[in-house]
Amino acid sequence: MRFDAVIFDLDGVICSTDEYHYKAWKAMADGMGIPFDRTINNRLRGVSRMASLEIILEKYHGPALSDEEKARLAEQKNDLYRESLKEMSPADLPAEVKETLDTLRGMGLKLAIGSSSKNTPFILKQIGLGGWFDAVSDGNNITRSKPDPEVFVKAAEMLGIPAERCLVVEDAVSGAEAGHRGGMKVACVGDAAKNGAGDWNMESVRELIDITKG
């Protein structure tokens, strides 16, 4: 076997919460009169909440905001987002993803989540994967967001697997960079795959089965 563990990004790989994020950020930005569209939203992929806020505030021309005010804005966005996440269910977990996860586990691989989101445990519970993974490294136990490799390095440590024996699965270029900086190979889907950011650039997560076999 080429790898002993697979570490998955959550959003855009296991499930998609893009639309929930977009609507929450847009509601916050609209309330402050800040222009916000899907082009700006695309820059937020794989980026932490506070770093995302700073990107949005590039278009803000009002009075200077204190750190406390910025924290309140980020919290407001998260409240809107978390409320919308209550609509998520196991139906938001694509069948091909669940089948691939089950197959990889059956092959004896350790499986983990590596996500910058502090909402990771809630989302996993909503889609029926609460407690399913061998390890979950997320925004609640890291201090640096992607492209810093911390989230993936911690996931590997939690699994007890050397970095070079871990495969990272990502859909964001910043996440692919994080995996590489952590000394891991990376398989990409979505935008990251289109940009050729991975060691393998996939059209479907099902390709992971052959990739991990080597």
Regions found by a protein language model. Give the residues of each.
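Active-site neighborhood of HAD-like aspartate-dependent phosphohydrolases
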Residues: 1-42
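Short, surface-exposed alpha-helical segments at coil->helix boundaries
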Residues: 18-23, 50, 121, 149
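Short helix-capping segments at alpha-helix termini
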Residues: 31-34, 61-65, 128-132, 160-161
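A metal-dependent, Asp-based hydrolase signature
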Residues: 46-84, 103
